Amino acid sequence: MVISADTSFLFSLYGNDSKTPDALKWSAGNDDSVWITALTHFELVNALRFAECRSFIGVGLSDQFAVDFRTDLKEGRLIEPSCDLGEILAEASRLSAAHTLTGAHRGFDILHVAAARIMRATHFLTFDANQKKLAENAGLIVPI
């Protein structure tokens, strides 16, 4: 089983929002590493900074949360393999052509699902209802 996650799940896990209890509960019951991409890594760290800039989280917390995230990467709870961006973009283009006109999917959401498929993920973690539909249509199991 390969589990991949999008930024909404990771922000809830490492940041602090209304879904944080759900992310922590899922994480406590899971022993498998979660696979992410450099795109997800970038988007999460930027989202943490954005949240601090907008005062959604306290001053200095974006750095603290990013350290927690990077610690989990270093300790293997998260895995960030090298991925071929060309492969991800090709799969994202395919998913967009197949689903965006009927599902109104955003670009980065499509990239995360495409990357999960390229990494041969079986499961996908997201708190974004629209992205959940895309992931399920792409054959991924979305357990939360």
Residue ranges with predicted function:
Residues 47-50, 70-74:
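Acidic/polar active-site rim loop that often engages polyanionic ligands
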Residues 5-6, 105-107, 128, 140-144:
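Histidine- and aromatic-rich ligand-binding microenvironments
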Residues 77-129:
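Active-site neighborhoods of divalent-metal-dependent phosphate/nucleic-acid chemistry enzymes
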Residues 1-42, 46, 51-64, 138-141:
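Short, well-structured N-terminal submotif of metal-dependent ribonuclease cores
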Residues 9, 46, 112-115, 131:
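Hydrophobic side chains within alpha-helical segments
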